[in-house]
């Protein structure tokens, strides 16, 4: 046991928590690309034997989950792409415009723990089918709300959160039960491509459909039909894998503990808590930029070119289109870059994942600030700085998800996903769009209305994002201090070497500083 422990401490942190070691396995740090490919094939065969799902079918399931993720983000940011039209149609202020996104996030946030609890205990495929069907129906209904009933439009947009809560707490755990190690990282990165691509397509589709149909309501009628296709794919193609089958090293089945025990254990997991707060800052920044970015660029264009984007109820969507394109490209580029850098850095540093996240957050802050500072003089420079800043922000999407999956035991992952969603949205993008709108309104109060005042007020409000980004980097740096210990504890549980709850009954007495001391079994095994 001693030799094995020392080897585990010295070995490079190449793979994630569920990459279990075999006796006589070569040092992961010395793997060539051919060896990694062979290892991937072996993992695929092993996964098929343990889950009863072939590698090809597993990839197909991930593609379906990617499609669902894409649709949900596309629907969410279609609203952001036509926000100027919504504001004109309902005659609302900046703060009320921010509420359109905030009510959705609040609904999503409060429903996430419910679906997290259900996802750890019941059929995950059925839960997603029900949630997505409801989301498609409510999204369609929201497109028929007339301009006299803004409160009803807010209500329907809030209910849309059911769909995202039903899949976002569950989909990553299904991927975790289908793949191991680097394969899991790659599949998670592919799944999270849908976040930026869906955001960008939402801006583009919203603006294109609105300009073609001459009515922004039609933009909300695109995704419901596609949601029905997603439900059919889940029913007839997707298959649910057994929970934690790939990670068990004994015949002892994984058993659920009570929800309160799950939450108590998660609150004692510093890597989970700190990475969740780090991701909260990501949600704050991206939520504010996603809703207000196109609107701010439109206002900047008014100041620079002395033009009026919205004339006769029709708005100029060049900025929404460009912002959407940038979001797509930078998201894919950032996720790919983050995963690849972390994979290579992990060979020499086991804390690679949180460190890459920290560098991305801290580095993005000055570029976000510069994008705002140059907006009234050069839109080209603004777009360039937005491109760099959003790329750096996107480094962490797949890495944060991977951190959660390898520091949390399989029977608590949906609950952990739900808690992370609640915290990140409660303190992040649930309030940031509304907060930015309120600050903008307060800055404008008492001043003569002008294009310059409208732009400046939103500019100063959005500068908060740069400071929040630096704070997020600090949380990820703190995560790096605990990541190894929490990862090993989750590994030991998955291998049947550690119970889910470390009470006094699972502690042993060891000599420490000349006296007998009770310590957790995990501290000895590690």
Curated annotation (Swiss-Prot):
GO CC list: lysosomal membrane
Q: What's the chief localization of this chain?
A: membrane
The job of this chain, per UniProt, is described as: Mediates the rate-limiting, proton-dependent, lysosomal efflux of lysophospholipids. Selective for zwitterionic headgroups such as lysophosphatidylcholine (LPC) and lysophosphatidylethanolamine (LPE). Essential player in lysosomal homeostasis.
Q: Which Pfam families match?
A: MFS_1
Picking any one GO molecular function of the record gives: transmembrane transporter activity
Protein topology in the membrane: Multi-pass membrane protein
Region feature Disordered, mapped onto this chain: 1-43
The family line of this record is: Belongs to the major facilitator superfamily. Spinster (TC 2.A.1.49) family.
Q: What is this protein called?
A: Protein spinster homolog 1
Q: Which domain of life is it from?
A: Eukaryota
Q: Which UniProt keywords apply?
A: Lipid transport, Lysosome, Membrane, Transmembrane, Transmembrane helix, Transport
For this protein, the record's InterPro entries field holds:
MFS, MFS_dom, MFS_spinster-like, MFS_trans_sf
